[in-house]
Design a protein with these regions (language model features):
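A glycosyltransferase accessory/donor-loop signature
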Residues: 1-5, 11, 17, 28-29, ...
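Zn2+-dependent metallopeptidase catalytic core
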Residues: 20, 24-26
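Active-site-proximal specificity loops/subdomain of glycosyltransferases
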Residues: 31-70
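Short, surface-exposed amphipathic charged segments that create phosphate/polyanion-binding patches used
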Residues: 46-54, 119-124, 190-192
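GT-A fold catalytic core of metal-dependent nucleotide-sugar glycosyltransferases
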Residues: 62-114, 138
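Conserved catalytic core of nucleotide-sugar-dependent glycosyltransferases
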Residues: 97-161
């Protein structure tokens, strides 16, 4: 069983199901989905931090709860932003091999500079080291460092401490090839997984963006309907 955690934001609910559909259709192993839904996490007493004016999604910080939500048990698990889609024929289970058991986490180590000053949702865009690294993560939940990712720490740590991985060390962050977090207009080569980080094609401004047809095809399958 491969556990997959997807960040949930009500403004991107269509993207959540589109991503899930693209994962299931090519899966070589059973998939267990958990959606990081902030109201549910808040009601459960797991998330209580105030909204950061710089955060653009509801799951900006809750993504780091993944090891805790797995009870820090052995077995590699995946977190994904919801604004992603797998290319046809891509098996998400291949990702876990990029996170050796002697590492805490594996990510695509982007060198990404945003092209605009506003993020999704209207939040201000801030360039910083390791930007987008946390948008796709393979965790080893039972390592010593991942066990430090408690609800208390995640609710009190700064965005820099979390998203720049100051809770671990550089030597314990494994690298995933960029084809697994491929950004339209930025990444080179052929993608396995496309990340519409500026906005999914469900948003009017990005309806016809690069590789939009891949997203729309998955959306139609997920909804079992035609969209004009």
């Amino acid at each position: 069983m491969l556990k997959v955690f997807i960040g949930y934001d009500k403004r991107e609910s269509a993207a959540v199901w589109t991503l899930a559909n693209s994962i299931l259709k090519n899966a070589s192993v059973p998939i267990s989905f958990t959606f990081l839904h902030l109201p549910s996490l808040t009601q459960a007493g797991i998330m209580w931090r105030d909204k950061d004016p710089k955060q653009s999604t509801d799951f900006t910080y809750s993504r780091f709860l993944v090891p805790y939500l797995c009870d820090y048990k052995a077995g590699r698990v995946i977190f994904m932003d919801c604004d992603m889609v797998l290319m046809p024929g891509t098996d998400l289970a291949e990702l876990v091999d990029y996170c050796p058991l002697d590492h805490d986490i594996a990510v695509v180590k982007h060198d990404y500079q945003p092209s605009n000053n506003i993020k999704f949702g209207g939040a201000p865009q801030s360039p910083y080291p390791m930007k987008l690294w946390s948008s796709l993560m393979v965790f080893n939940p039972n390592t010593f460092k991942c066990r430090q990712l408690t609800p208390k720490y995640i609710n009190e740590a700064t965005g820099q401490e979390l998203h720049q991985f100051q809770w671990t060390s550089p030597g314990r962050i494994a690298a995933i090839p960029e084809e697994w977090n491929w950004i339209p207009g930025h990444s080179k080569g052929e993608p396995k997984l496309i990340h519409f980080t500026e906005g999914t094609p469900s948003w009017k401004a990005y309806k016809d963006c690069q590789n939009a047809e891949v997203w729309w095809n998955e959306y139609r399958e997920a909804c079992a309907t035609e969209v004009e």
